[in-house]
């Protein structure tokens, strides 16, 4: 079901640039026909089932409660962040991430409160796909994995296994598992409602928009927000124009 969460929207980052790196090729999508079919399936399920439930949840659930729920699940996922910080050779960050997890798991009442940020232990976003990128693996073909992941790639797909194995929820059995998992899905989808609306209103082709936004956000994460300038074309650049430059502060 993670896909249905991500099918809605990966990220708005990067939509102000045109990627022309190296050969100038667009995102490799040799499986586009199958990917589009999977996207359509997820989008249909989302609109028919998950989105209405998430909208109701967002309306009736107080914001502080939703923040606490989000913090709780972010904290559970953070073991994956810690491991991949170390695997990428970010030792100082790995120690900070470990301390963040310990503080939020204890003083933060199981992660419901984000006390770590208040004391300067900032949240990071690392996963095995980023680790493979740091190790030199290319992204490979774009993949859309229905029901469990959503936008992905050949390089990012293995993170499904590693993030699952490192998530404590994986080892919960019995009647507790299903309601907790359902809460995670619904809360995550509710957090994406505004982004979904923007995507649907702005994109002529939501599939392509989702794909390009995902791939550009992955580049952003891999480079820790410091993207290389080579290979990116400034869409505002026009050497033949006499118009004054637009300055955004």
Go through the PLM ranges and name each one.
Residues 17-23, 135-249:
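A structured, mid-to-C-terminal "fold-capping" secondary-structure block
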Residues 12-33:
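Bacterial Sec signal peptide processing site at the extreme N-terminus
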Residues 75-150:
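Mid-length scaffold segments of soluble, non-membrane domains
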Residues 2-12:
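Bacterial N-terminal signal peptides
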Residues 30-63:
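Post-signal-peptide N-terminal segment of Sec-exported extracytoplasmic proteins
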Residues 69-72:
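Beta-rich strand-turn-strand
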């Amino acid at each position: 079901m993670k896909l249905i969460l991500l099918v809605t929207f990966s990220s708005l980052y990067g939509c102000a640039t045109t990627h022309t790196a190296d050969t100038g090729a667009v995102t490799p999508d040799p499986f586009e026909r199958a990917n589009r079919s999977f996207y359509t399936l997820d989008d249909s399920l989302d609109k028919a089932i998950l989105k209405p439930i998430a909208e109701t949840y967002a309306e009736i659930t107080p914001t502080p409660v939703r923040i606490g729920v989000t913090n709780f699940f972010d904290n559970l996922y953070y073991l994956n962040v810690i491991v991949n910080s170390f695997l990428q050779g970010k030792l100082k960050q790995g120690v900070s991430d470990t301390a963040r997890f310990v503080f939020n798991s204890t003083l933060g009442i199981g992660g419901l409160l984000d006390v770590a940020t208040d004391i300067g232990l900032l949240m990071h976003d690392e996963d095995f796909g980023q680790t493979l990128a740091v190790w030199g693996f290319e992204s490979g073909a774009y993949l859309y994995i229905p029901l469990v992941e959503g936008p992905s790639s050949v390089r990012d797909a293995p993170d499904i296994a590693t993030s699952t194995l490192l998530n404590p929820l994986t080892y919960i059995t019995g009647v507790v598992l299903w309601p907790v998992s359902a809460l995670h899905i619904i809360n995550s989808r509710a957090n994406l409602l505004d982004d979904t609306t923007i995507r649907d209103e702005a994109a002529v082709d939501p599939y392509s928009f989702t794909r390009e936004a995902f791939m550009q956000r992955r580049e952003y994460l891999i480079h820790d927000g410091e993207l290389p300038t080579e290979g990116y074309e400034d869409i505002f650049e026009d050497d033949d124009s006499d118009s004054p430059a637009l300055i955004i502060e």
